């Protein structure tokens, strides 16, 4: 509804400040410039956030759905879950903007071993999809970095073909 949209749009300055503050901290830690990447907000119902690297016609940006991160929605994310979401997307930024050691490039995919390695550096939950409370759990990154993805809903790439998910929940 338009009332909710207006309330959520009024929150964007707060979210922007929260995200930039976190990304500036991570940038200092890693020598990167993620806090300078444009941040946009929308009303996506099927994704919480995204990082677009900026190839071809795509502009580099972070994008977050106010329907998930907003304070005035029915079931807002906790601060810990919001921070984990922001780190999740920053880990995608890291994949494109820093050298990943070869030993962490064995598993292809958007949430493959390189992304998991980036998660391990910043304390993001190495889970491809949002799960409430994942950001609070102490993750065994060594184990996660060596484990193949077994979730059949995640696209996997092999040398001969591309397998896409057949069902989405």
Identify the meaning behind each predicted range.
Residues 104-144:
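Post-HExxH zinc-binding segment in Zn-dependent metallohydrolases
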Residues 90-111:
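Catalytic Zn2+-binding segment of zinc metalloproteases
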Residues 1-10, 89, 95:
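A short, surface-exposed helix-loop junction/capping segment
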Residues 46-79, 97:
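Active-site scaffold of zinc-dependent metalloenzymes
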Residues 159-169:
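Conserved small/polar residues in nucleotide/adenosyl-binding loops
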Residues 137-159:
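Long, well-structured alpha-helical subdomains associated
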Residues 8-58, 128:
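Auxiliary, metal-adjacent structural segments of Zn-dependent hydrolase domains
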Residues 79-94:
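Short alpha-helix carrying the canonical HExxH Zn2+-binding catalytic motif
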